[in-house]
């Protein structure tokens, strides 16, 4: 306890006389305040301008995670397209090795506010004097007021030189990006479609000690706000198909269960092997079935976004709507392959879905994304290089427990619809003709495009 009190006193002296009165401008920041109650018992936080684009931020707080919103926040009110960036650093680590420095976008300073952040943490030990930025960076997301803050994409291996969070509206889509710079330019850590955010938001630096008995002091540099930044790292899919695809609306859906001696414990690798060879490690799959549906809204057990589901083919008899569990049993260890041709306009699109356990989506021969968790809906942002018809492929797997699959499209007006729902304004999808599948397959499309370019 004596050591903690000494460290606390030292930190308070470092910021003594600093203009940290809540609401007063401090350098580039117009506001500096504690969020939640991080000052009990550690003491209140503050922000001090020490050099050009460099600040000391003193903070306590139990964490920025789940429903724990306890941190010090130096921020501005922003509108339109804007990026906030900083170089993370620590003067005194203190507290817990999960003490964090973040760039954070919020709706307000209430605990439980909708928030999107790019987070770093200090060194991987509990030495209070440790002042090292750990080689970890992660996106943090709270998309619903008073829900838990959860983790999106995380990277390790290198220490970031800069982090940033930005809001950009492009082609009608409002997007939030978490960005990381390892010294050679910005990289896209995570991109989120956020249709419901207001124009005016809070954007700035957040620091927490992850331990209310300690204060930590972060030293952040290269602090800057940038108006009208461009999107970073958005994938561009391959070329449109060079041949006709089909004129029957819908998707071809194929489901197969793992054999008696195998399972889907290998994740996507096992799922790919099962849907392409109908076996895993030579063990033949069972209960194969296929069907053509206008949309992909499948349920075995445990519904998510949309009702009026249909059962998975093969593993259960046809049901619409499904009475859970479909077929009267809870099926495990199966994979589903969805193929189609999709009509897209040139430019930005947002397509994704939900799956328990997981699904990945490929368009134009390029993987546009994978779901992060069984209990999240993940939408993937990409660009189509031209207006045309593109190959579409999705692979889903289920290991155990509840299971469903929804493929979704976001519209610029903020609506989320089932992919293929043309009546609602969505992109048209078509079942590939057998001749097209035989000629190209969905691994051969990229090969044909290469030959066509030569």
Regions found by a protein language model. Give the residues of each.
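Extracellular glycan-recognition regions
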Residues: 24-241
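Active-site micro-motifs of SAM-dependent methyltransferase domains
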Residues: 225, 360, 446
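Residue-level detector of conserved catalytic or cofactor/ligand-binding positions
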Residues: 434
